[in-house]
C-alpha cells in the first residue's frame, strides 16, 4: 500500500478491532452537510499522486518517492485510471484518502493547486498528511459509536466527532493536530479497550 509522509500511529491494533466489531458505520454528519469522508477526486489536486510513496512490487509497477509526481499523472488526473490494475497498480485502486485530499484543496487552500502554484507544494503535502490523520480518526470514532459505550463515553465520542467534522481547518491547525487533539482522541480510544474482547491484548 502507499506510504504517506508524516503520519502517526493512531493505535493501529485498536483501530482494526473496533472497525471489525462495528460493521455498520454510523452516519454522524448532519444531512445538510456533505460527508467529510467522501472522496471526490474532481475537487482535489491529485495530492495522493504527489505526496505518497510506493515501492515496485505486487501493488505498484515502479518506485515513487514522496513529493515526486507520479509519472502517470496528467494534469489533475491519472492517465491510466481506467486500467490501473491491468497496468500494475492495484494499490492505487485500493487506496482511499477518506476525503482528505478534496477537503485540503477546497477548505484549506481555497481550490488552489500545487501544479499552478508550485510554492504551495510542500504546504499542501503536509496538510494532506495531517488531514488524513484527522479523517482516520473520524472514521474510527464513527465506528466506536456502534459499540456498547457508556453514556459518558458516547458523549465524548460525539464531541470529538463534532470538532473534527465541523471545524474549518487551517494549515497551522493541521500542523498542530498530531501533537494536540489527536493525542486526546488516541487516549480516549485506548480507554475503550474495556469494551473489546478480554483476550485482545494477549501476546501484544
Regions found by a protein language model. Give the residues of each.
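Short loop/turn segments that flank or connect secondary-structure elements
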Residues: 29-47, 53-204
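Hydrophobic alpha-helical membrane-insertion segments
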Residues: 4-6
Amino acid at each position: 500500500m502507499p506510504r504517506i509522509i508524516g503520519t502517526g500511529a493512531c493505535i493501529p491494533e485498536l483501530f482494526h478491532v473496533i472497525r471489525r466489531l462495528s460493521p455498520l458505520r454510523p452516519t454522524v454528519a448532519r444531512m445538510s452537510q456533505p460527508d467529510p469522508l467522501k472522496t471526490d477526486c474532481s475537487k482535489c489536486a491529485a495530492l495522493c499522486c504527489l505526496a505518497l510513496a510506493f515501492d515496485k512490487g505486487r501493488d505498484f509497477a515502479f518506485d515513487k518517492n514522496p513529493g515526486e509526481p507520479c509519472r502517470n499523472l496528467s494534469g489533475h488526473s491519472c492517465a491510466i485510471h481506467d486500467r490501473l490494475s491491468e497496468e500494475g497498480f492495484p494499490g492505487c485502486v485500493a487506496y482511499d484518502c477518506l476525503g482528505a485530499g478534496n477537503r485540503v484543496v477546497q477548505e484549506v487552500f481555497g481550490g488552489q493547486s500545487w501544479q499552478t502554484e508550485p510554492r504551495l507544494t510542500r504546504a499542501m503535502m503536509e496538510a494532506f498528511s495531517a488531514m488524513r490523520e484527522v479523517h482516520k480518526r473520524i472514521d474510527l470514532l464513527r465506528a466506536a459509536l456502534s459499540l456498547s459505550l457508556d453514556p459518558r463515553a458516547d458523549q465524548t465520542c460525539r464531541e470529538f466527532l463534532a470538532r473534527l467534522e465541523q471545524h474549518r481547518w487551517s494549515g497551522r491547525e493541521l500542523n498542530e493536530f498530531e501533537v494536540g487533539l489527536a493525542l486526546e482522541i488516541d487516549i480516549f480510544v485506548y480507554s475503550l479497550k474495556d469494551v473489546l474482547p478480554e483476550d485482545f491484548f494477549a501476546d501484544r
